[in-house]
């Protein structure tokens, strides 16, 4: 039980500092907001979580304003539980990504599981039925025992929650780097489908309307979780287990179905709905009121509790999972109670909407908080941080390009070593723990460029992916940010989809350090540039800052989640070569792009140098490939990324056990170059003429570089290895390293 302090004791002890408030912020609350009154224990705690970076984006709000967020396809952008994009037929796709980084280091299983649960609630709070989960994971070196434990438990947590609730985990990415050793990244994306008429907002309006608490009971888990996520890791952070929530996917399944039933069958009495996520009850209710320009009066005696003698501070800040807030029209309370009772869930009237603009709490007949509602939400502070270019950036800019030399005798061994690199090697051992087929909508499961799910009742499908190569951002945040969006779009296009929009998780270091704030704001410039060029507005997202351990920051890692629309399921394309005799086509030119590459990291142990990125060529090549797919000319398509052409060719050959015979005018090293904007395609010989005719109508570059064979040999210039041996290395590397 938390011991409550008096307002005077709070001021004297400055305990608010431990909760994340600065002296200046505390004085602002006391003098400017409360007119000289000392905030009490509950009020101070509420401001501490609501003014955390995790809740109010006080350091990143100016950066987020750079993003393009509108477009004809966007029905709802940032500001609600998730973004909503039109896909025609009065249907929309709803999606968002969230981070659960700090909790997943302290308690990897529960941290990852509750990260999944939280983002699922964001989706069904919009009225959508969740249809897919994707993840983006970053870990330290896998030869470290602690890292292996975190990998094992994080993936088990995601699998456990998704498998139990019955939502398929269909895609994602995993990468390893020293910078994540003390600060893994666990980003989870959820995608849902909705009819336009059921789209909801998180708002509490209409004087006298009732505020309902629904779902699981409140405990003491997760108190100050939002503040915990807004600080650097230090030597004692691993012991902060009370800040980590505990999830129950079976409870969430009931909550999901109950909320969907309310929205679809009782939408006329539902004013607003929101998930109780970070900062729990105070965040959800104050945000709903602030967005509507209302006030709220809540009676905490009615809050369902699973622990005894909880004080208002604990009830308001608890981040117990599987809880929602509903605003219901006055006079219809019993309908809500009866509906949730059918699912054996609590549905309790805890307050009402007012018109005084205040957030007022009562407990045991006493007023325990009375503050302006906007001061908790819309009027939280915003900081304009100093940005300074890190010294390393100038060094990289002035340096020569990294140009490795690989002899004919060494190229096959280099290729084998690259196949076994943890970031490149097959993640099959991870994604096979996920149920990717439940709900029976999955057409393309994990392992291809993007996951693809059919849209039932239509001839359409959705392609979805997560992407980011943080090494590029370390060398050049602007170009790296632009590349992250472009690679996500390449994955969608290679699957036959037209990119629609993105969500993001901006994982960066301490924004109070000018060099790290520069990384954030510069990466946002690059993301915006690609979003504008590729017509993929930012419709939702999340910011996770202070990803540092003992002063050492992670690589800047803005994860991009993207969804694309496949208008006709016949255009769904996968990366594997289909049959011997098909021609292998390279779209895009290959240059000496080794800075930040997997090859550079493997051969030198570091990354350095300057990177190039031609966004105009990227767009041209993507448009050409998508047109070739929709014209029915392509049998397979795969984007080139880590490991370059050689790795992409191998991955395309693996699934069906085929061979390749490729002769291409490249040096041995260039087989592993990571020039952007490239695809490997396979086409039937009878489609070659039509393909080349289409090429003449585009400014894209393309050449036939070989053919698919059935001899089981991967031959690329002087590189030669059996497909079976390559598959064995590729699929066996990660399980071997995890032992």
From Swiss-Prot:
Q: Which UniProt keywords apply?
A: ATP-binding, Cytoplasm, Ligase, Magnesium, Metal-binding, Nucleotide-binding, Purine biosynthesis
| Catalytic reaction list | N(2)-formyl-N(1)-(5-phospho-beta-D-ribosyl)glycinamide + L-glutamine + ATP + H2O = 2-formamido-N(1)-(5-O-phospho-beta-D-ribosyl)acetamidine + L-glutamate + ADP + phosphate + H(+)
Q: Which domain of life is it from?
A: Bacteria
| Alphabetized InterPro entries for the sequence | PRibForGlyAmidine_synth_PurL (IPR010074), PurL_linker (IPR041609), PurM-like_C_dom (IPR010918), PurM-like_C_sf (IPR036676), PurM-like_N (IPR016188), PurM-like_N_sf (IPR036921)
Cellular localization per UniProt: Cytoplasm
* Broadest EC class assigned to this enzyme: ligase
Q: Does the keyword Metal-binding apply?
A: yes
Q: GO molecular function, one example?
A: phosphoribosylformylglycinamidine synthase activity
Instruction: Quote the catalytic residue positions.
Output: 54, 100 (proton acceptor)
E.C. number:
6.3.5.3
For the ligand (Mg(2+) 1), the binding residues are 98, 542
* One GO CC term, this protein: cytoplasm
Which positions does UniProt annotate for ATP binding?
57, 96, 504, 541
Q: In which pathway does it act?
A: Purine metabolism; IMP biosynthesis via de novo pathway; 5-amino-1-(5-phospho-D-ribosyl)imidazole from N(2)-formyl-N(1)-(5-phospho-D-ribosyl)glycinamide: step 1/2
User: For binding Mg(2+) 2, which residues are annotated in this chain's numbering?
Assistant: 122, 275
List of residues binding substrate: 99-102, 121, 245, 319-321, 544
| Any one Gene Ontology BP term | 'de novo' IMP biosynthetic process
Q: What does this protein do?
A: Part of the phosphoribosylformylglycinamidine synthase complex involved in the purines biosynthetic pathway. Catalyzes the ATP-dependent conversion of formylglycinamide ribonucleotide (FGAR) and glutamine to yield formylglycinamidine ribonucleotide (FGAM) and glutamate. The FGAM synthase complex is composed of three subunits. PurQ produces an ammonia molecule by converting glutamine to glutamate. PurL transfers the ammonia molecule to FGAR to form FGAM in an ATP-dependent manner.
Q: Which HAMAP family match?
A: PurL_2
- Annotated family: Belongs to the FGAMS family.
The record's subunit annotation is:
Monomer. Part of the FGAM synthase complex composed of 1 PurL, 1 PurQ and 2 PurS subunits.
Supply the name of the protein. Phosphoribosylformylglycinamidine synthase subunit PurL
Q: Which organism is it from?
A: Lactococcus lactis subsp. cremoris (strain MG1363)
Task: Report which gene this protein is encoded by.
Answer: purL
């Amino acid at each position: 039980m938390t011991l409550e302090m008096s307002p005077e004791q709070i001021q004297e002890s400055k305990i608010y500092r431990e909760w994340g408030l600065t002296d200046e912020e505390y004085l602002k609350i006391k003098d400017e907001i409360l007119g000289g009154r000392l905030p009490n224990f509950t009020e101070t705690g509420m401001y501490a979580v609501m003014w955390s970076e995790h809740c109010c984006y006080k350091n990143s709000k100016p950066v987020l304003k750079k993003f393009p967020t509108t477009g004809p396809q966007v029905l709802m952008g940032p500001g609600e539980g998730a973004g909503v994009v039109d896909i025609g037929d009065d249907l929309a796709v709803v999606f968002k990504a969230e981070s659960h980084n700090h909790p997943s280091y302290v308690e990897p299983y529960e941290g990852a599981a509750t990260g999944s649960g939280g983002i699922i609630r964001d989706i069904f709070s919009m009225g959508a039925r969740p249809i897919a989960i994707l993840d983006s994971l970053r870990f330290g070196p896998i030869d470290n025992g602690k890292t292996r434990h975190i990998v094992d438990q994080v993936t088990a947590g995601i699998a456990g929650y998704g498998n139990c609730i019955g939502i398929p985990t269909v895609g994602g990415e995993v990468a390893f780097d020293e910078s994540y050793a003390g600060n893994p990244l666990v980003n989870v994306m959820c995608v849902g489908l909705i009819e336009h008429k059921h789209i909801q907002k998180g708002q509490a309006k209409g004087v006298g309307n009732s505020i309902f608490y629904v779902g699981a009971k409140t405990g003491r888990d997760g108190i100050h979780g939002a503040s915990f996520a807004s600080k650097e890791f230090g030597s004692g952070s691993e012991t902060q287990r009370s800040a980590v929530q505990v999830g129950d996917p079976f409870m969430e399944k009931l909550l999901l179905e109950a909320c969907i039933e309310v929205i679809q069958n009782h939408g006329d009495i539902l004013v607003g709905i929101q998930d109780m996520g970070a900062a729990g009850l105070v965040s959800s209710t104050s945000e709903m009121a602030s967005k509507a320009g209302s006030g709220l009066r809540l009676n905490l005696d009615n809050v369902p509790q699973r622990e005894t003698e909880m004080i208002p501070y604990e009830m308001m800040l608890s981040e117990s999972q599987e809880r929602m807030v509903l605003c219901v029209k006055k006079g219809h309370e019993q309908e809500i109670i009866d509906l949730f009772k059918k699912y054996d869930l609590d549905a309790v009237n805890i307050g009402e909407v007012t018109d005084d603009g205040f957030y007022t709490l009562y407990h045991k007949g006493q007023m325990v908080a009375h503050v302006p509602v906007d001061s908790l939400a819309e009027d939280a502070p915003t900081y304009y941080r100093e940005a300074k270019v890190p010294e390393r950036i100038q060094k990289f800019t002035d340096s020569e390009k990294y140009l490795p030399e690989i002899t004919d005798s060494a190229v096959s061994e280099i290729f084998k070593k690259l196949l076994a690199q943890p970031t490149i090697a097959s993640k099959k051992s991870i994604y096979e723990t996920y149920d990717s087929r439940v709900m029976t909508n999955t057409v393309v499961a994990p392992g291809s460029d993007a996951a693809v799910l059919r849209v039932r009742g239509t001839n359409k499908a959705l392609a979805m992916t997560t992407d980011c190569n943080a090494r590029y951002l370390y060398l050049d945040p602007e170009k790296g940010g632009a590349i992250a969006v472009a690679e996500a779009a390449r994955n969608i296009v290679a699957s036959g989809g037209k990119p629609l929009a993105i969500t993001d998780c901006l994982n960066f270091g301490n924004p109070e350090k000018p060099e790290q704030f520069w990384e954030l704001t510069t990466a946002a410039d690059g993301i915006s540039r690609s979003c504008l060029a590729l017509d993929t507005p930012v419709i939702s997202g999340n910011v996770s800052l202070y990803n540092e351990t003992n002063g050492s920051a992670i690589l800047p890692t803005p994860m991009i989640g993207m969804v694309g629309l496949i208008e006709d399921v016949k255009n769904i394309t996968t990366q594997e070569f289909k049959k011997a005799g098909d021609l292998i086509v390279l779209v895009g030119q290959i240059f000496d792009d080794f800075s930040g590459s997997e090859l550079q990291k493997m051969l030198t142990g570091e990354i350095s140098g300057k990177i190039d990125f031609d966004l105009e060529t990227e767009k041209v090549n993507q448009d050409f490939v998508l047109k070739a797919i929709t014209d029915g000319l392509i049998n397979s398509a795969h984007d080139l990324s880590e490991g370059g052409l050689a790795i992409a060719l191998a991955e395309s050959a693996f699934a069906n056990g085929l061979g390749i015979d490729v002769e291409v005018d490249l040096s041995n090293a260039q087989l592993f170059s990571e020039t952007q904007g490239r695809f490997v395609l396979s086409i039937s010989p009878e489609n070659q003429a039509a393909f080349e005719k289409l090429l003449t109508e585009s400014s894209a570059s393309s050449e036939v570089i070989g053919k698919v064979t059935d001899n089981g040999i991967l031959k690329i210039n002087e590189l030669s290895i059996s497909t079976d041996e390559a598959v064995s290395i590729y699929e066996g590397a990660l399980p071997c390293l995890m032992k």
